[in-house]
Amino acid sequence: MNLSEYSRRPSGEVRIGRVVIGGGHPVAVQSMTNTDTNDTEACAAQIERIDRAGGGIVRLTAQGRREGENLANIVRRVREDGFDTAIVADIHFVPEVAAIAAKYVDKVRINPGNYRTDHGELEALIAQCRERGVALRIGVNHGSLSKRVFDRWGDTPQGMVVSAMEFLRVCKAQGFDQVVVSMKSSNTRVMVAAYRLLVEAMDAEDMHYPIHLGVTEAGNGIEGRIKSAVGIGALMADGIGDTIRVSLTEAPENEIPVAELLVKHFARRPGKFPVLHPERYSPTEYRRRTNVAVPVVHTEPQEGFCVIEAVSENPTAELRAAILNLDTPRPVVVKRRYGETSPETLAVKAAADLGVLFLDGLADGIWIDAPGFAEEEIRNIELMILQAARVRFSHTEYIACPSCGRTLYDIEKTLAAVKSRTSHLKNLKIGVMGCIVNGPGEMADADYGYVGAAPGRITLYKGRTVVERNIPQEEALDRLVELIRDNGDWVEP
């Protein structure tokens, strides 16, 4: 990591169908279907919409043998329609399904947390991928580490890295380099730390696999875009990332413009900003520079604060260097002027530029100077950036998955309904998850959870504890509100 100037991390080339990532190629954007993988027409239509929007890589879940075999029909239909989209299978739990999927798709994603390896399954999959020219993604999820790793390391960034490196070492020993790796979490601080630790671990073992970036369960609307931009932007500012997915609880094609905006935003970052005291900074250890309890926004009193404004095309490096070079313990407000006219563009760019300074404990206040926007609109964006960076909580936080073919209900409508009933509960975190694969783990720090258990059935959580199982979906929202009331966390709107 170069603290003084922007440079992309060197990585090897990996071919995913027609798309090549790593090796200095442009950062690729991608998405994932949320249709039933057994529904060939619906999946093909959604893949084609994503491709037309600019997403050249599309992933589908294959949770069983039937879904794995139907990938052949989906790929065939997409090709017949004239699309050469790179198609990826997402596998959990069943190595046999990975072997089926590898016969048809361009890349297979497996999760070390739930992929069996005791009988040479990984080596067999590598051999199959090599023979067919199929790429492999080692995709670690914070919410689904194996029991063995969890018992030793807990659900920590270090545990995520241990999980990934075990699989990457097998790939290296097999001489297989068509590998991509990811370290996803809904917690931006965990996610950024995990990726940075992974890069350190790979560098130490001379590994140069391309990296797939993403924040899981970011939610929807402007909040979801800001949360993704804070996490992904923090790493892209470090030069990390060869392909990205902005996970939103919306139509998958809505993710593509946000991802493309981030790629374009980091495409050119000139300027060199020497850091005189690099010992004051650790990319993998969170520590606050000051003891300011609650970071401020620009409309709040800033007596005794030092305001530092970025004026270059590389605001993150400029501000970081200026803060690290300060010879005063005064708290710092970071300021940046934007000429944007779109609220979404302003929010994404500001989150990508400034969020990392709070993730790293360097900044104590945020000031977005945007003449085209009302003060209240700017203030709301600033507060959402601080919340996404996990330094100040000012509104209800929703940990909501983007949904996929495993999702057991209409998650977009459900999230909207949950928000309409609970958005006034400012100090709560509420998880709304499509299924049990990553749901309970990814929402582990949520106060309450709403998780799909079976078609038309919902399980409710208080923290990590199941409170009610298999509730009829039509009753689940009222029961969630009752659960919040029963635990003393409800206030009248």
Describe the function of each predicted region:
Residues N34, R52-V78, P112-T117, V179-T188, ...:
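Glycine-rich, proline-tolerant flexible connector loops at the mouths of alpha/beta enzymes
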Residues S11-T35, L71-A72, R137-R152:
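N-terminal small/glycine-rich loop or linker at the start of catalytic domains
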Residues N141, V149-Y286, E303-V432:
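Catalytic alpha/beta core domains of metabolic enzymes, predominantly
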Residues M1-S31, R130, R268-T299, A416, ...:
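N-terminal amphipathic alpha-helix/helix-capping segment at the start of soluble metabolic enzymes
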Residues T85-I87, H92-R137:
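Hydrophobic or amphipathic alpha-helical targeting/insertion segments
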Residues R65-A89, L125-V134, L198-M207, R268, ...:
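Alpha-helix-loop-beta-strand connector modules within alpha/beta enzyme cores
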Residues G24-A42, T61, T85-F93, G113, ...:
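Active-site mouth loops of central-metabolism enzymes
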Residues V29, D90, I138, V181, ...:
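Conserved, mostly hydrophobic/aromatic
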